[in-house]
Curated annotation (Swiss-Prot):
Lineage: Bacteria, Pseudomonadati, Pseudomonadota, Gammaproteobacteria, Alteromonadales
Database matches in Pfam families: ClpS
Entry coiled-coil feature ranges: none
Domain of life: Bacteria
Cited HAMAP family: ClpS
Species: Pseudoalteromonas atlantica (strain T6c / ATCC BAA-1087)
Protein name: ATP-dependent Clp protease adapter protein ClpS
Assembly and binders: Binds to the N-terminal domain of the chaperone ClpA.
Listed NCBIfam families: PRK00033.1-3, PRK00033.1-5
């Protein structure tokens, strides 16, 4: 094998490694799930507080949760999605609501 071929193979390996390192992180949807007990106003409050939505968008998502059973609140990297789920769950428990927040890979 010539020296040029060896160098080209090494460069290709390095490029493959760089491409793997530069791949975007997996993304996760954060979802709110409907229940029969959590008030609609509380769901809107959660959406505004934890997902930085304006009240109109929060109202639309709340209605989607109510009528379709669940809705996407946002899409984040794994760590941020986990944090959002934890924050919403703790906040709901603190206010004695059974609101469920989950995450799914996109």
């Amino acid at each position: 094998m010539s020296k040029d071929n060896t160098i080209n193979i090494e460069r290709e390996k390095q490029l493959d490694t760089v491409k793997q390192k530069l791949a975007p992180p997996p993304m996760y949807k954060v979802l709110l799930n409907n229940d029969d007990y959590t008030p609609m106003d509380f769901v809107i409050e959660v959406l505004v507080r934890f997902f930085n939505l304006d009240s109109e968008k929060a109202h639309q998502i709340m209605l989607t949760v109510h009528y379709r059973g669940r809705a996407v609140c946002g899409v984040y990297t794994a760590e941020i999605a986990e944090t959002k789920v934890m924050q919403v769950t703790q906040y709901a428990k603190k206010h004695q609501h059974p609101l469920m927040c989950t995450m799914e890979q996109v």
